[in-house]
Amino acid sequence: MSKVLVLKSSILAGYSQSNQLADHFTTQWQSAHPDDSITVRDLAAQPIPVLDGELVGALRPSDATLTPRQQEALKLSDDLIAELQAHDVIVIAAPMYNFNIPTQLKNYFDLVARAGVTFRYTEQGPEGLVKGKRAIVLTSRGGIHKGTPTDLLEPYLRVFLGFLGLTDLEFVFAEGYGYGPDVAQKATEDAKTQLSQLVTA
């Protein structure tokens, strides 16, 4: 039995294309793997605090007394990392906002990227400590950017997730939603087809 973690990050709730694709994936996965468990974390509905000068002090080893706000941030970071490590399949719904990931997802990344916990530095270089997992990124865009210099999202996510140890990584692109209903419909259909294939892979 596998455990699946689905991370949503769109600010558009039910109107979000990436959220709808994530919901489709969840439904397909439950149908194909009825014994598996699925956890959905909506980073827009349950926002993660922005990492600032005070909070970053909570995430670094120190003997200093933590403020109540730092204590909350450290506990949240510990909980998020434990949740991440406890799952076998990580699904990230990451729409493109202004050529990058949503702030909500970046805030999550900032709390789960911790030296000595999710990665470490060795004589051979950095080593990710989030290992043995499969990761799937669902990314929706108004324009068409895949394979072009304007797609900053895919290379960033490959570097960041790989840095944590998530190297078994697949992308599903749903592009062109700003080009009209016909293009949008085909983008959704193609993405759903690919997702259905990944569910049974």
Swiss-Prot record:
As its record notes, the protein acts as a catalyst of: 2 a quinone + NADH + H(+) = 2 a 1,4-benzosemiquinone + NAD(+); N,N-dimethyl-1,4-phenylenediamine + anthranilate + 2 NAD(+) = 2-(4-dimethylaminophenyl)diazenylbenzoate + 2 NADH + 2 H(+)
The terms under GO molecular function for this entry are: electron transfer activity; FMN binding; oxidoreductase activity, acting on NAD(P)H as acceptor; oxidoreductase activity, acting on NAD(P)H, quinone or similar compound as acceptor
What EC number(s) does its UniProt record assign?
1.6.5.-, 1.7.1.17
Q: Which cofactor does it need?
A: FMN
Annotated keywords: Flavoprotein, FMN, NAD, Oxidoreductase
Note the subunit structure: Homodimer.
Which family is this protein grouped under? Belongs to the azoreductase type 1 family.
- UniProt name for this protein: FMN-dependent NADH:quinone oxidoreductase
Species annotation: Pectobacterium atrosepticum (strain SCRI 1043 / ATCC BAA-672) (Erwinia carotovora subsp. atroseptica)
